[in-house]
């Protein structure tokens, strides 16, 4: 059972680290109409939200991995039920928040790629920001995959919670 609990946490940690790293390196410089500008991930609130949640998930998953490997989850400062309940609540919260951040960033990427008829021009094509847009989309995809792993961890911690006697 321990391996089953560890695998999704490893997946969540690795993919959130990849999503964070790719998004943090997303930026592109363009020249046009006599001026030079740089587009960075930090210009988009949705991408900032995505980075913040992926960093939080990476730290949380890494701490959970260390505690699972060292079997310190039944520590003396808390009852097993309270500990498992806390893990379940954190897993649920992070799963919803990461899925929300990934959805927001996917919307920003979609608007950048295709625009919105008569309102928002397709930034990727208009300013030829192909590298920026491709890296942002890759980071969003990794974040969605990471959310799949934290959702799996949440399901497993819910199952574990149902097996621990309430005290």
From Swiss-Prot:
Segments on the Cytoplasmic side according to the record's topology features: 1-2, 70-80, 159-167
Primary location group: membrane
Domain of life of the native organism: Eukaryota
Extracellular side: 24-48, 102-137
Membrane-spanning segments: 3-23, 49-69, 81-101, 138-158
Family designation: Belongs to the Casparian strip membrane proteins (CASP) family.
Membrane topology label: Multi-pass membrane protein
Keywords noted in UniProt: Cell membrane, Membrane, Transmembrane, Transmembrane helix
Protein name: CASP-like protein 3
One GO cellular component, as annotated: plasma membrane
Subunit and interaction comment: Homodimer and heterodimers.
Record's keyword annotation contains Metal-binding: no
Native source species: Osmunda lancea (Fern)
Pfam families: CASP_dom
Subcellular location: Cell membrane
The keyword Protease is assigned to this record: no
